[in-house]
Amino acid sequence: MTDPSVDEALARRAAQGDQYAFGQLVQRHGRALAQAARSFGVPESDVDDIVQDTFIAAWHALDDFDSDKLFRPWLFRIGLNKMRDLRRFRQVRHFLFGAKDIEDAELTSDVPGPEREVSARLELAKIMQVLNRLDLASREIIILTSFVGMSHPEAAMALGTSAKAVESRVARARAKLTALLQSSQV
């Protein structure tokens, strides 16, 4: 977890044109954004583009950033919007042209590793399959709170809702996920 006060200080400096400060924000949050994108089912070939597009949009919107609020949820809200945009684009393309991407058939890993790592990857792949069966709202809340590690107030800011609503959504999403996992024998 990153220190919010450091993020806000870096964001203020970046808003004044300090590229080094912005680079520090990229280093501090790039990996978590990439993991969130993967968790949302963004194909590996698009993950770096989503992260880059998110940071470009954040750079351009820094003047609108309210330094009284937390930077991380603000950034992840931009990232979620970029992921939704990609999903909509793919849905429209599939509807219009019937195009499916080769990335949809990617393997988790084609490099053999220790048995433990392979087993962990298989388990994660099963969980991700079940997670992808959840509705988008449930998937978003599980990924932000469980995978990214956001608190309920942070997730609320990222999703544009209240912390109480996040608490309810987390409970419902976990119940759905548990039911799917049990029915799938994962």
Curated annotation (Swiss-Prot):
InterPro entries: RNA_pol_sigma-70-like, RNA_pol_sigma-70_dom, RNA_pol_sigma70_ECF_CS, RNA_pol_sigma70_r2, RNA_pol_sigma70_r4_t2, RNA_pol_sigma_r2, RNA_pol_sigma_r3/r4-like, WH-like_DNA-bd_sf
GO molecular function: DNA binding; sigma factor activity
The gene coding this protein: nccH
Keywords: Cadmium, Cadmium resistance, Cobalt, DNA-binding, Nickel, Plasmid, Sigma factor, Transcription, Transcription regulation
Family, similarity comment: Belongs to the sigma-70 factor family. ECF subfamily.
A Pfam match: Sigma70_r2
Feature: DNA-binding region: 152-171
Origin superkingdom: Bacteria
Role: Sigma factors are initiation factors that promote the attachment of RNA polymerase to specific initiation sites and are then released. This sigma factor regulates the genes for a membrane-located efflux system that confers resistance to nickel, cobalt and cadmium.
Name this polypeptide is given: RNA polymerase sigma factor NccH
Gene Ontology biological-process annotations: DNA-templated transcription initiation; response to cadmium ion
Residue span of motif Polymerase core binding: 49-62
